[in-house]
Amino acid sequence: MEPAGHSSATHNIVVPNANPTQPQPLAPAMREEGATLSPPNTWSSSSVEFLDDADDNRLLFTCTFTLPHGTVLSSATYADGFHEQYLTIGDNFLARLEPKGQSFILSAAAASVKQRIFARVTMPDGALRACELLCEFETDRAKITVLALRSAFSLQASHVSSNFHVFTFITKHSSTCALTHIDYASIPYLGLLPTDLIGKSLLAFVYSPDVHVVRQAHIDLHNSRGKIVKSIADLRLVAHNGSILRCQTEWSAYVNPWTRKMELVVARHRICSLPIGDSDVISSPPPGIQSNTLPPVMAKTFEDELRTIMNKPVPSTSRHSHHHHHSSLKDQNQGFPANIDLGAYIDKIVEQLVVNSTAQQQQKVAVAAAAAAQAAQAAVVATAQIRKVASAPPTTSTDPPLSYTQINCLENVHRLLKSQSRPESPAKQDEPFDEKKYPPQTPLTREALTLHTKRFEDEYKDTWCRRLKRLSDDVPSSPPAKRTTPIHWTSSSQNHYRTMAPAPPPPPGKNYQITYTPLDDLTDQKSTNTKSDVENVAYPISGSKFSTPMRLSIDGLLPRGATSTGGASPTSGTNSPPVFPKTSSSSSLLMLRDSQN
């Protein structure tokens, strides 16, 4: 079907099936629209855009070809200069495109149903021209509508008036300085297709003398931790035909919160003037014209500098804000807010005191405020000078000291606040002092101090006695221990043991170990055995408890010259136990003394 307004179109149509009675309808497109390619972009199915393009005489030709070979099935040309032999049936349409355009069309056919692609097409005169391709893909074929791209600065364009309209577009580049995105709407202004720039260096379309502007912008981005910064000067860009465009650029960066490095930089370029040179930025540059961009060797050097800046961690927040809050911290240390001068600060305090005071106190406050205001007027100049010094970059490590006038003013304010801290009632102030109501004071003598100290000591003593008594009352007392008497003891046995004398104390100057042993029953004393149980019992001593041999001696109990039974010495080394003399008190006592060899 021929679009409206183009009756002189030339058609080349071929029928795929030779049998006209059995037409084969085209298979419906069952694929859904997928992710768009970059730079290709999806376009709406509405015909409004197509009609606008047709009325604007941008329509060049339409073509239907097979996939993936690109054999032309039908074509129709609408623009002047396109003859019938430009696209004939059986020709290869993909051969009319540059290599990048061929790969993008085949990739878009596998991903979506409709796609908008920007590519350069070979014109009838053999020149490559940037065009817009509206593609509709089916299972084994594709229909392409080719629209011409025109310069935004061309006088033939109907949407360009005498007054220039400001245009803004966005570019993005990674930490390797490679462009990852550029608005396709910038094509009429730059003449560069997204396929010409994506993957290439940022400096590929920057005017060579303005490279330092890009470098300084990256340094400012690093210092501001990725916040928006403006270029120090207008950035000049080079169009496709070699013309120069002047634009105002703002930069912003994404900083990785873990590595603190800039990973992506976004630039917003605002073209605000006509190009310097040929206004047809879409056309190819004339032959023999030298490019205005940096040579590859110099461009690589600047790219390395930009990579170094972006791969360096940005300064921390505390370090960045140290200089920003330097002056405010100084003012806070001086005792008044940073954004209010000293005179206004004192006036505010005096106003609060006057409002909160009584009628009789207002006169006193006014007098004190007048004295403080005089010092405040002299301190305003000194405060401004100190703030000016504090806002400037610090040249020395020490802070500037406070001036004498400022210290005097602050002291007046403190005295004023101190005098108003404990206001007294007017009745008490006017009442005369009566000495009769108050007793005479006791003179401060040594006796008075002694009595005073004794009185406090008695109070402390009584207090501690009460505390100890309260603690003793809280603790429950345990009942006295009761010693049970053996069952087989008679009353006579109990009385006999009660009448026994206590054991004698050990002699002084010697180490003794006293051990009590159970006593024998009185009924067993009539036994024929004359030795006591203590004499018949052997006491084995484990050698593991003593590091050296030990011998037993009873020299402390026996009189001089006395020996044990049998004439054996206690230190003779025999295993027989020692024999003690039988006395009423020694029958219940065993005394041992340790002596090392």
From Swiss-Prot:
It is found in: Nucleus; Cytoplasm. SMART domains: PAS. It comes from the Eukaryota. Residues 561-577 have a biased composition (Low complexity). InterPro entries: PAS, PAS-like_dom_sf, Period_circadian_regulator. Transmembrane segments: none annotated. Disulfide bonds: none annotated. Residues 487-497 have a biased composition (Polar residues). Residues 1-44, 313-335, 418-450, 473-509, 555-597 are annotated as: Disordered. This is Period protein homolog lin-42. The gene is lin-42.
